[in-house]
Structure formats: C-alpha cells, structure tokens
C-alpha cells in the first residue's frame, strides 16, 4: 500500500519545522571559534536519540572544544535515523556507524536462554553474571522500561529477545570501540540498551565519555571517570565540598533556591515533572478537605508517600537496597499499616499518565487500612504538600519541595541528595523499615532542614546570574524546541559565548559535573526555568534576609537520631 501523502497543512508544518531546524543549527555551526581542537583522534557522536536540545548541547560542545567534523563518526540506533543524519549533516559530519543491536545474534540468544533457564524471580536477574562485569541492574532497567511494568515480567513472551538484545548491545559496544579506537564519546544518555553498554565499556577502557544531558532549562553535562559513575550522574557537590561552602555563597544559593521552589510549587516551572505536579488547578484544597475526604482525624499527622514512576530506571542513582520501586512500596505498606501514629497519603508520580504503563494503584491491595489513603490525581500538588506534615520518597524532588517548608523527609536509601543533612538517610533496607515504624517526623529541626535544603535547591534548580534569560524549554516539547532555540541563541549571543568558554574550562579541569563547576565559580544566582516577569539576582557576599545562619562546616551530616522502637498499634 502506498504511503499516504501529507495533507497541505501537515506539509506546511513539516516545511516550517525543517526551516526552524536549519536556522537553529546554522547559529550553532557559525559560532565555532576554536583554532585547534581540544581532542585529537576519533570522536564518536551519539545520534541514536533525536531531540532538538541534544543537538543544541552537541553544538555547544563542538564550539567549546573546537571539534572538527572530519574527526567525528555519527552513531545511529534503530530510530530517527533520517532526522539525526540531517542534524549531523548541518555540522558536516559524513561518517556514520550503525549500532545494530536488533540483529539476530545466535550466541546472544543462546546465552539469554541459559540465563533465563534458572531464573525464578525478578530478583534473580539482579544476581546475573554478565559479560564485561556489566551491571545487571542496568539490563533490568532497560528491559523494565520497554515492558512498562512495575517489576520485570518473566512471563513476557519477548523476554528472551530483550535479554539477547542487551547482550548484543555489549558485543556491539566492544566492536564499535575496537573499530574506531575513539578518544572521546559524546552521548545523550548513559541509559538504555546501546548507550548503557557503550558508556560502561568505554569507562572500563578509560575512554573519555561526556553525557550531553540537560535539565531545568540548562546544560547539565557530566563525564564518566569510572564505570560505577553510571549510578552517580546527577549534578551535585560532594558532601565535603557542600560542608565547606563559605557562608555568603551558601546564603546566596539558599535565597535563589527558595525563590525557585516557591515558583515551582506555584505552577510556574516549565519542566515536565513540575507541569504535571503543580499546574493542575482543577482541585485545590485545604488540609480539612483532605481529612474529610479520607475520613481521618484532623489532629493526626499526615505523611505523604511519594511513589516514583515504576519503570523509569529505578537503579539509576544507586538504588540498590530494593529490587525496584515496586519492591520498596511492597515492603513499606505493612509497616505503614502497623504505624497508626500517622495517616499515610499515597501519591503516584504525576507523570504516570503521560508515561502510560503500570502505576502505583496497580500494586495496591483491594482494601487498605483506614489510615492509608490514595491521593486522587486531580489534587493540586502544592495543596497536597501544604496538607501533609512530612514526606517519604525514594529520590524525588518532593524531598526538596517539602524540606523547603522545614518539613521532615524520610528517604528509602541512597539517591542524589541523601547526604546533605536535611533528610533522614537510612543506610540499609532494615534501617529504613525500622525508622518507618516509628514517629520519625517528630522533633525535627525545621530551621536546619529548610536551610540546608534551600542551599541544595539553589545548586540543583538555579543557574549563575550571568546566564539569566538563557533558559531553554523541556526536552519533552520535541520539535517545537527548534524555533525557541533559534530565538534564544539569537537573543543571547554573548551569554552563549560565555557558556562555551566555561564548557572549555570544565572539560580541561577534569571535574565531573559541568553545572556544579559553573555554579561554584559564579558570583550571583537566579532562578532557571521558572516563568517570571523579572529575575532577582542573589549575589554572593550580600546579606541574606531569607537565611541568616551560615552553614556550619563542622556539623556532622549523619541523619537525625531516630528512636527505632516501633510505635504501639
């Protein structure tokens, strides 16, 4: 059957998109200014993930390092090859290499069959011994993402093929690196079948690898220096550097962080998570509305329990005390059922509907105890936060949002902000369950929780003052980003130049996280992707009205002492 031609309106839209893309890419190409490249040898450029902002990030990196197209090889995956080729052509990249992980590989299929033969539970997969010491958690997460299930489905008729694909991806990674002997890899992610394999093998070989990531409208590039860095990739300060922050910088970060969190929970942030969490104004409610709807006593504390999207790479931040998010929820529910000192409000991830697939409600029993309720998805996130007294989360931004109000935060274990001293961080699964069984939310130091979390929010959500205005949209906006990108690049050429100069300095420094590198060298801070009529600059060295106490660099960052004697039921 012949492919149906585009309608006139669709054809015009396609032509407009192509023109927007060409103009945006031309601005990036024309800005290349380095006389000699910062990297010798072959550079492998990821083209397996097509997104306007990925090519923005690549263009900034090319400009910053003076990379030459003749040294580059475009890596193509199974999807969006035409679009990626078109973008690469704008940079005069002509060589390409296909990452053929979908090929029928007899050896990989046989090995997949052998691994699955003695696999009885999803937990068994996490104990597999894989080639090149590849982490089974990454294989688990890649398959889980495809299945869109809460836990890996062993009855999936395609499971053998999925495991074989993961094993083939490792073979393809080895063959690709052997063939091209690259000096540098530029990747969009270090997740999924082909990119997790490439990043792991490259790190084991000591090949320089930079992931061109972005978040909150800004560039969040990071580099792998060790294989285990694949589980530690969220832009962050090390604990000792956080403790050593000079008071004036901590204050400026806290002021900016507080302003950003306020804008975020007010529904003014443009990232996809915040849009779904806080821009739903259909039902805004008071605490009494919550207790009335749930038939709860108004005086009993309400603890929010925020559940992550079940199949969104659960192990990506080193989440190693649980099989997956479903396992965490399943072991938490009986403890919450026994702890009647609080009412527990279960909230599914706000993006679950957008993602599709299984969600929190699919895991819950038909009947819950009266003191455990399910938060309706229509309830506004800011109103829910205001109604709750504390929160339990794995590693969600809810921890920062609650802590900004001085409310206690209990984590399931390690995440990306676990060791900054504002949240209770259990070191083991059993310690988490022991704490969960107690009234852990009592006697919290609200001022300390708020102060420390706002500093982290400043580092995580905000950006340097000199960059104010150069904020890009969310990757989920897809092709609509091209037009906005052109406008931003045209409006802020000097800021783009400064960004590239810092990118060059960061690459030479050897530090892992670009955004942190940039923030620690700034003399002022402002909100990033929060819509506002004017931006406030929070200067280092200026007295802070919001946070007056300097960060105590001698303070131990161990979690607050919690009496782990179980409460009476």
Where are the predicted features?
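Conserved N-terminal ligand/cofactor-binding loop architecture of enzyme catalytic domains
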Residues: 1-46, 64-167, 214, 218-283, ...
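Short loop/turn segments at strand-loop or loop-helix junctions that form parts
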Residues: 46-47, 76-79, 214, 302-314, ...
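A short, glycine/small-residue-rich beta-strand->loop->alpha-helix junction that serves as a flexible
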Residues: 47-57, 187, 313-319
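Histidine-anchored nucleotide/phosphate-binding helix
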Residues: 51-69, 73-78, 197-199, 322-337
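Donor nucleotide-activated moiety binding/catalytic core segment of transferases
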Residues: 164-178, 298, 342, 352, ...
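Conserved nucleotide-sugar donor-interacting segment of glycosyltransferase catalytic cores
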Residues: 169-224
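A donor-sugar binding/catalytic signature common to diverse glycosyltransferases
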Residues: 187, 213, 220, 377-424
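Conserved catalytic-core segment of nucleotide-activated headgroup transferases in glycan assembly
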Residues: 266-363
